[in-house]
Amino acid sequence: MSKTFKLHSAFQPSGDQPEAIRRLEEGLEDGLAHQTLLGVTGSGKTFTIANVIADLNRPTMVMAPNKTLAAQLYGEMKQFFPENAVEYFVSYYDYYQPEAYVPSSDTFIEKDASVNEHIEQMRLSATKALLERRDVVVVASVSAIYGLGDPDLYLKMMLHLTQGMLIDQRSILRRLSELQYVRNDQAFARGTFRVRGEVIDIFPAEADDEALRVELFDDEVERLSLFDPLTGQLLRTVPRFTVYPKTHYVTPRERILQAMEAIRAELAMRRQSLLASNKLLEEQRLAQRTQFDLEMMNELGYCSGIENYSRYLSGRGPGEPPPTLFDYLPADGLLVIDESHVTIPQIGGMYRGDRARKETLVEYGFRLPSALDNRPLRFEEFEALAPQTIYVSATPGNYELDKSGGEVIDQVVRPTGLLDPLIEVRPVATQVDDLLSEINLRAAIGERVLVTTLTKRMAEDLTEYLEEHGVRVRYLHSDIDTVERMEIIRDLRLGEFDALVGINLLREGLDMPEVSLVAILDADKEGFLRSERSLIQTIGRAARNLNGKAILYADKITPSMARAIGETERRRERQQAFNLAHGITPQALNKKVTDILQLGDGPVRSRTKGARGQRAAEPHPDYHTLSAKQIEQQIQRLETQMYQHAQNLEFEQAAALRDEIHILREQFKNAS
């Protein structure tokens, strides 16, 4: 029998949580397709959802609008369900440049990507968990609506091994090669296998710290055991084991041969069409590229950019939706969309941008028309595939409200008794000097401040001005990547600086109890950055602090401001009434600052102990005395260290070394 969910928490549901849990569960059991949970900041929305999952015992996908929030949710769910399968499914690209063609300058840009192996392993682990068990929570980003290998083919390709099974060594090795595993008797890494006499060691693609040892005797599987690939220590013997493919995109040989025939037929038709339109260059280009891909598929079973032929490989018809993570989710699965007012529009926008780029590639002979079917889901396809759905947001959008028939499950009362921030409106004329004095007041008592501006220029100028006046301040902008952004937020919580200035980056889901003041400059400039939802979300960043306050700098009260202030006051009054009725004194949150990049308690496992305290590079090393040859050697040495740190998820050290290498390269140019 499949394991059931077991929720671990020191707390019992309280405040609005018990009623919200009851209504959500009732709705799901009554077959409601859409429900909306309006949960304010700090009301324990994740805990409510965790209780619903545990009570109903249904496999669940939680979708977040970005990797940062997905990582935060993954960490929380890991703590709630340490005995169950909590998985993480986001895009595995650290860097991704899709292939594109710019007709105006006749520039073709090749696809270029850097895959994060660790996230790839977590994606494989997520699909494996969905196929094998029911006690699964997959925390995903919008990456879940992009094409993935067909689950039916994926299941067909698996290698099942059982103790006592009759199979010769050659057959096992051939099957492993079909699963795209690579033989490597020297470096034993994820997705490889090695052979020593009658013993085959396999490092499963979805595993992080366990490998399989297959011991054969006279063409029979004598013993199957799991061991630690790092130390070689035997962990336990198992009666059976399933080896999953190295990638989601593996395809049986017969399907590849069928696909090749269909691709040849489409190529012939497309060539005729291009020649009839007198597009000779495009016809030649398409024939050359496609025939090269066909040759690669025939010899190796795959080719670069094989995803462009996914329609044929998955056996789907023209225009049919591609297989995605939703195809792996059981029929009675549950979908939770976090920060739905952001996530839903994102899902709706993915298809069109992808389509526009691919149409250009098809028109100019870089791809066959069938490449258009390698795409994310259209919004209506997503709606058709989505199981019973709970939308979670402090500010639900019109779509969610419409889908749930205008009925909203309120979770406004916080168990901690914390009130929504007090709101003050102050004049714009003195906003900068007034802000400076407010920051100094907060810094003196060890509290933090968030400041949101309307433009990048304003944010830069304000940061510079505050720095000149002795404020420890940082500026958060869109050019900062996910990892660095999480480091900045962690440093703010740790007190490395007192104020953080940003534009549209200080809204949904950021969990910072140390922030006691949110300052919104130019709050009376109507627009999406100063809409009712944006203002409520931004004000909510101070709702986790006992002394939470929001200052809106404005010369007039706009309709959006009036609605945001009214809604915040409504929530504040409801919380005060609850506190009074139950004798609750508001308590400060003491949430420990964890390194969110380690994604909960697993499955990340750092290979180096105590590396955190090491210095990645000298603060200001002097390279001027080195020769060009010595600089070259130093670059190679630092690059090796950088990749090692990145592999161990020690991003601060890797980033410091990257900057060091950049300085050295400049020096190398000058020296040579």
UniProtKB/Swiss-Prot annotation:
Pfam families in the record: Helicase_C, ResIII, UVR, UvrB, UvrB_inter
Positions of the UniProt region annotated as Disordered: 601-623
Example GO molecular function: excinuclease ABC activity
Broad class of the protein's primary localization: cytoplasm
Helicase C-terminal domain location: 431-597
Domain Helicase ATP-binding: 26-183
Location of the UVR domain: 632-667
One of the record's GO cellular component terms: cytoplasm
Transmembrane region(s): none
A single BP term in Gene Ontology: SOS response
InterPro entries (UniProt xref): Helicase/UvrB_N, Helicase_ATP-bd, Helicase_C-like, P-loop_NTPase, UVR_dom, UVR_dom_sf, UvrB, UvrB_inter
Keyword Secreted applies: no
Record key words, sorted: ATP-binding, Cytoplasm, DNA damage, DNA excision, DNA repair, Excision nuclease, Helicase, Hydrolase, Nucleotide-binding, SOS response
Motif position, Beta-hairpin: 92-115
Keyword DNA damage annotated: yes
Subcellular locations according to the entry: Cytoplasm
Residues where ATP binds: 39-46
Coiled coil regions, renumbered to chain: none
Role: The UvrABC repair system catalyzes the recognition and processing of DNA lesions. A damage recognition complex composed of 2 UvrA and 2 UvrB subunits scans DNA for abnormalities. Upon binding of the UvrA(2)B(2) complex to a putative damaged site, the DNA wraps around one UvrB monomer. DNA wrap is dependent on ATP binding by UvrB and probably causes local melting of the DNA helix, facilitating insertion of UvrB beta-hairpin between the DNA strands. Then UvrB probes one DNA strand for the presence of a lesion.
Family as reported in the entry's similarity comment: Belongs to the UvrB family.
Subunit structure comment from the entry: Forms a heterotetramer with UvrA during the search for lesions. Interacts with UvrC in an incision complex.
Domain notes: The beta-hairpin motif is involved in DNA binding.
Entry-linked NCBIfam families: PRK05298.1, uvrb
Name of this protein: UvrABC system protein B
Organism annotation: Edwardsiella ictaluri (strain 93-146)
